[in-house]
Design a protein with these regions (language model features):
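Short alpha-helix in the alpha/beta-hydrolase fold that links the catalytic acid
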Residues: 107, 116, 130-139
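Short beta-strand/loop motif that positions the catalytic acidic residue
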Residues: 113-115, 120-122, 126
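Catalytic histidine-centered segment of alpha/beta-hydrolase-like enzymes
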Residues: 153-167
Length: 184
């Protein structure tokens, strides 16, 4: 079993949503949410066929694609090696051992097709997943969207750094889209 940076996990999220709607009923609104790789997973899932009860997506510090995050990490931490050949080797390894390509999925492609509203959250001091990745996803997102940038928050710390602001954004997002009609 391998972690696939959201590529295969997106289908797990969609399957979970279908299971929840089947067992709890379509009248109960569902939201997909995740942090870091979980955020990437739910952003990728947003473009899949989801049940109508999925009313929105909450993504805290998601990355653009497996290739983009690997490139970013290599540039930040392995500066003395060229990223290109290493990414090629990583792609071969992920294809052989985990059954996916690091070039296979992009949150930018997914959010440019989604109908579900998305709340993007990201800390401006994130040195692992660059804040620009959420900004770019927000910019290309085709659905209703909101972007909360938390000054000074490192990777995954937005809620802890500015709890009142993030809580207020979450509450407003959930309230707004819980009461809306199901998305077909």
């Amino acid at each position: 079993v391998y972690i696939t940076f959201g590529v295969h996990e997106r289908r797990d999220a969609a399957t979970w949503a279908q299971y929840a709607e089947k067992h709890f009923g379509p009248e109960h609104p569902l939201f997909l949410g995740g942090l870091s790789m979980g955020a990437t997973t739910v952003l990728l899932a947003s473009a899949l066929e989801l049940p109508p009860s999925v009313r929105g997506v909450i993504a805290d510090c998601g990355f653009s694609s497996p290739e983009a995050i690997m490139r970013s990490v290599l540039r930040a931490h392995v500066k003395w090696l060229p990223a290109g050949p290493l990414l090629g080797l990583m792609d071969v390894c992920t294809r052989v051992f985990a059954g996916f390509s690091i070039k296979e999925a992009s949150t930018l492609d997914a959010v440019s097709k989604t109908k579900r509203p998305i709340l993007f959250i990201h800390g401006t001091a994130d040195t692992f997943v660059p804040c620009a990745m959420s900004q770019t996803a927000y910019d290309v997102c085709a659905s209703e969207k909101q972007l909360i940038l938390v000054d000074g928050a490192r990777h995954g710390y937005s809620y802890l750094v500015d709890r009142p602001r993030v809580q207020a954004a979450l509450a407003a997002f959930l309230e707004k889209y819980t009461s809306q009609e199901a998305i077909q």
